[in-house]
Amino acid sequence: MNTGLDLEVSFNHLLQDMGLSSTISHLLWLPLPMLLVLTAALIGVLVTVWLERKISAAAQQRIGPEYAGALGILQPMADGLKLLVKEDIIPDKADNLLFTLGPVLVLIPVILSWLIIPFGQNLLISNVGIGIFLWIALSSIQPIGLLMSGYASNNKYSLLGGLRAAAQSISYEIPLALAVLAIVMMSNSLSTIDIVNQQNTLGFLSWNIWRQPVGFLIFWICALAECERLPFDLPEAEEELVAGYQTEYAGMKFALFYLGSYINLVLSSLLVSVLYLGGWGFPIPVELIANTLHQSINSPVIQIITASLGIVMTVFKTYLLVFLAILLRWTTPRVRIDQLLDLGWKFLLPISLVNLLFTAALKLVFPFAFGG
């Protein structure tokens, strides 16, 4: 189902109607995608931080933030401003270049990964044919930044935290990639748009979660580990490592780690929504909505309605998963480092391999149901 809304085409037509040439309109469009990504990511982080604070307060029978704006909604902005004006301290014996570069290498790949996230048929920044592969490639850069930050701090706690972060990320990237590969195999495409379209034929019955329940669980567990969320927050375990690789960081550099962690959480939830929960798709087929309203499926009214509802559905599914991740953080104990690595290498990796082989077999036997 095509929403008929293409951001770039609509923007260029608008500027050309105002008298600007096509060349100028294309040049003005170039910086907009990244601005849209940054805006969406920052808004997503602000909402997620506020949710985390209120849910954690409820779990601990507290009130939580309530003075900064209505219901404390402006508290994340107050925290950000506080970190922004704090002094930027670099330890005397730290490696200045690596110490500064580490947080940047952690944040930039996460932000760039938002380029492939679709909120509708044409409502995404970059519709590249290898979107999933691009995301996996970008996510593999983050452990380098974490290890670099821990090493450059010249602190034993920071180094241990960086080593843990790198080991954890590498251990869980492989089963995560294998779980995604099963989805790619069924969709016959690496494009996030194609993966969502393949799930929108029969409403919620065609969502990949029903055909890949094991893959869904593997992906979700690995995503939480990649985000370093409890019960997998070993790299920054306060009782053992003070703050892990973040120990020597303050001010804006610390804020970059904080920002990257929450952007990664929202991104992971978006990817689960896209890969397993139909993305912008509705629980019922779009054709039923068009028939109920007595409109053609290609009419402008239906196009606008489906595009708007598609954004709402994507955000709703995403924050449902964010809510689940926050609940898990405040209700589960931290695992040990040996348990963490055993889970990744001895359980999730073999299970993800078996799941991939089983998916390939089902695709051969039941091609109509598994994308043959």
From Swiss-Prot:
**What top-tier enzyme class does this entry carry?**
translocase
The entry's cellular-component GO terms read: plasma membrane-derived thylakoid membrane
| Spans traversing the lipid bilayer | 27-47, 97-117, 128-148, 176-196, 204-224, 270-290, 308-328, 351-371
Membrane topology reported for the UniProt record = Multi-pass membrane protein
**What is the protein's quaternary organization?**
NDH-1 is composed of at least 11 different subunits.
Instruction: Please explain the role this protein plays, according to its UniProt record.
Output: NDH-1 shuttles electrons from an unknown electron donor, via FMN and iron-sulfur (Fe-S) centers, to quinones in the respiratory and/or the photosynthetic chain. The immediate electron acceptor for the enzyme in this species is believed to be plastoquinone. Couples the redox reaction to proton translocation, and thus conserves the redox energy in a proton gradient.
Q: Where in the cell is it found?
A: Cellular thylakoid membrane
Gene Ontology MF term list? NADH dehydrogenase activity; oxidoreductase activity, acting on NAD(P)H, quinone or similar compound as acceptor; quinone binding
Task: Note the InterPro entries from the entry.
Answer: NADH_UbQ_OxRdtase_su1/FPO, NADH_UbQ_OxRdtase_su1_CS
Whose protein is this, by species? Prochlorococcus marinus (strain SARG / CCMP1375 / SS120)
Q: What is its main location?
A: membrane
What is the name listed in the Swiss-Prot or TrEMBL entry for this protein?
A: NAD(P)H-quinone oxidoreductase subunit 1
Reactions catalysed, semicolon-separated, are: a plastoquinone + NADH + (n+1) H(+)(in) = a plastoquinol + NAD(+) + n H(+)(out); a plastoquinone + NADPH + (n+1) H(+)(in) = a plastoquinol + NADP(+) + n H(+)(out)
Q: What Pfam families does this protein map onto?
A: NADHdh (PF00146)
Which keywords describe this protein according to UniProt?
Answer: Membrane, NAD, NADP, Plastoquinone, Quinone, Thylakoid, Translocase, Transmembrane, Transmembrane helix
* EC number of this enzyme: 7.1.1.-
- One of the GO biological process terms: photosynthesis, light reaction
> What is the similarity comment for this entry?
Belongs to the complex I subunit 1 family.
